[in-house]
């Protein structure tokens, strides 16, 4: 390996889902700062416009898309090739959380919505990405997002969400084995407590304080802390890492 400050990222093309959210936006900004062209994807068109305005360099593009539209995945990824000149990285950050006070409040709709977005759409998008990367013959990086809930089982009524994130870990391992021979790595990032609207939503101040008190480093992560892990996994420095879930939790989760 030849060492470089850019770690092989300048000139690459990344598709970032959930790009209008707190973590996804930071991932997109970090990629652009590293010389990567970004196709930012989210259901929030106004949020995408804001994120696109923050990206340096380029070219960049955005698309408002509900990833539950599985038949759009191939076209979406092909757009990165056609408009930005390639497809090297999928940073799949998109996810939803419906937190209920207890199990009895969980509805079938809660279950279906979270599994459709967090797990079903993730599998089919990962598969579409792996196929396109394999066909292009230049390898690639797929980076999924799990959660500390995959290990802990969730908190604050988020058991269904945790179940989907456990599925992400298993799926990531299986796809890593599937695509390894094609020089495509598949990994996941597992956040702990990150200061985002998703984390704060549905929690009382007391519950939030209790959660932060369990973090050995004593504070919540910022979205940029997660973006750093994504850039590492997308870089040449991580070329021999696959099937791994990187825990970014300030010591909250240790395994």
Where are these regions (language model features)?
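Substrate-binding pocket helix/loop in short-chain dehydrogenase/reductase
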Residues: 101-103, 107-115, 211
